[in-house]
A protein has these predicted regions:
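Surface-exposed coil loops of outer-membrane beta-barrel proteins
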Residues: 1, 18, 39-60, 133
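Structural signature of outer-membrane beta-barrel channels/translocons
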Residues: 1-6, 20, 65-69, 97-99, ...
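Transmembrane beta-barrel strands of outer-membrane/channel proteins
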Residues: 3, 14, 29-35, 62, ...
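Repeated loop/turn-to-beta-strand initiation elements of outer-membrane beta-barrel proteins
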Residues: 7-10, 25-27, 70-73, 102-105, ...
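Transmembrane beta-strand segments that form the barrel wall of outer-membrane beta-barrel proteins
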Residues: 8-17, 45-48, 72-81
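Mid-chain, structured segments of secreted extracytoplasmic proteins
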Residues: 13-48
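Internal, conserved structured core segments that host functional sites
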Residues: 54-84, 88
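Outer-membrane beta-barrel transmembrane domain signature
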Residues: 81-162, 167-176, 180-183, 195-197
């Protein structure tokens, strides 16, 4: 469920407040939960089962968005505040909403930067893990992953709208080269309800 007022917002796994909110400019400060993690016990791979778990983490985020007739450009940076990876992420994207037969269709293109500490925590393999699992030790550097997202929405009343979205992300070389990762592309899907004040 997404909720937005003149002063605060709740979207997905992020909540925060508006430091600036005008028709053209928005500056937001928020906290989000990044659910990326790895539970070795759930793996079907015998060697992966011998790795350490990777936990999800909380991020403090600063986001700026500029809106015009050409669409919206958004830039954000977030830092791990839970002491898991101690890394950070940065995202820059463009998006524009189109009305199509009563539905909203919003394409979005962007790039996601993930720091060395972030990548190494989630995708690196220590020498101790390598020794007990048989997987090659791996130390990840920072990387950039481009992505495309398509969002569809429909207003069902003055206050409520529903939406669904799909994301395709090309994994950075630093991520896809990890022995923990099988594949070059990550897919994501989501749906929800938005409440408009």
């Amino acid at each position: 469920v997404d909720v937005e007022t003149d002063h605060f917002y709740f979207k997905g796994l992020e909540a925060g407040g508006f430091l600036v909110k005008t028709d053209a400019h928005r500056l937001m400060l928020g906290v989000s939960y990044m659910g990326l993690g790895f539970d070795a016990g759930d793996s079907d791979n015998a060697r992966m089962k011998k790795l350490d778990d990777r936990d999800g983490s909380f991020f403090a985020n600063v986001t700026y968005a500029w809106r015009s007739q050409l669409g919206q450009i958004t830039a954000s940076i977030g830092a791990d505040i839970s002491g898991k990876s101690e890394g950070f992420m940065s995202d820059v994207s463009w998006m524009k909403r189109f009305d199509v037969a009563g539905f909203g269709v919003t394409p979005q293109v962007g790039v996601l930067f993930t720091s060395e500490k972030f990548n190494d925590y989630y995708y690196g393999i220590s020498h101790a893990e390598s020794k007990r699992s048989g997987l090659d030790a791996y130390s990840a550097d920072a990387g950039v992953s481009p992505y495309f997202r398509l969002i569809g929405d429909y207003r069902i009343s003055e206050k409520f709208s529903v939406y669904a979205e799909g994301t395709v992300r090309s994994l950075s070389k630093e991520i896809k080269d990890s022995p923990m990762v099988d594949g070059d592309i990550a897919y994501g899907f989501g749906a929800g309800v938005s409440y408009h004040f």
